[in-house]
Amino acid sequence: IFTKAQNKIQDPAKLYRLIDMVDSTEWVTMGADTKGDIYEGLLEKNAEDTKSGAGQYFTPRALIKAMVECVRPEPGKTIADPASGTGGFFLAAYDFLVENYSLDKNQKNFLKHETFYGNEIVANTRRLCLMNMFLHNIGEMDGESAVSPNDALVAPSGKTFDYVLANPPFGKKSSMSFTNEEGEQETDDLTYNRQDFWATTSNKQLNFVQHIRTMLKTSGRAAIVVPDNVLFEGGAGETIRRKLLENTDLHTILRLPTGIFYANGVKANVIFFDNREA
């Protein structure tokens, strides 16, 4: 959580008032739900501020809750998100399991320590995610991190999961930054060459769809938010859609209303599919 943490408040008086305000609150008497709700509220408020750019890492909680309720995860099963953002899918799945099942001691321990696994390559967002999970009683402050800082698309995860819930970052192409000979920063399209992918493409969303399929156990289930290009793009997109229909039970496509995301004009959908034996 504290990896590469920085203090960006330069005004000593302002920092003093902030510390004094935090210190005056009786945090010990608050339940985990209250602290977690306060933190979630701050994240959502920050996402609503379009100037902050945080909205791209924050999936609307009503959408997350609806997706989790459609998938209906069960106790003792694993849940992954290869683009974790601030951890919304993990929290919603946690709440669903606690509210809908009478969990015994072993199931509660599994839920806290072994259920969730994710990736988030943006360091600040990953830090927000880990704190969000900790405040909602998922994982430990000093234990092994449930959210890896590595790019999920570079290589197979090496693990398979019962459920994958994700809203991969929008923006059509994967890219990488580098410094050219003149010392200037440039970006270049990034193509992932993986033997377990059906097609090679620089389209980020199509790569996430392929990657998520490889993350599923034989009986695994997935729900993914995707933009329109995943449904309509030709070439590699057509190949991936055909393979998805042949190799999984793609049973539902949910069209989302415009305006549901903080980024303006985004047209998005949720695809639900169940893996099956080859």
Model regions and ranges:
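Flexible, glycine-/basic-rich loop-and-beta segments that form/coincide
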Residues: 179, 261-278
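Non-catalytic, mostly N-terminal accessory regions of nucleic-acid modification and defense proteins
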Residues: 1-75, 141-152, 255-259
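Glycine-rich, charged/polar anion/phosphate-binding loops
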Residues: 208-211, 254-258, 268, 273
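A generic structural signal for residues located within well-ordered alpha-helices
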Residues: 34, 59, 124, 204, ...
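Conserved S-adenosyl-L-methionine
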Residues: 53-166, 171-175, 182-184, 206, ...
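Glycine-rich S-adenosyl-L-methionine
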Residues: 186-216
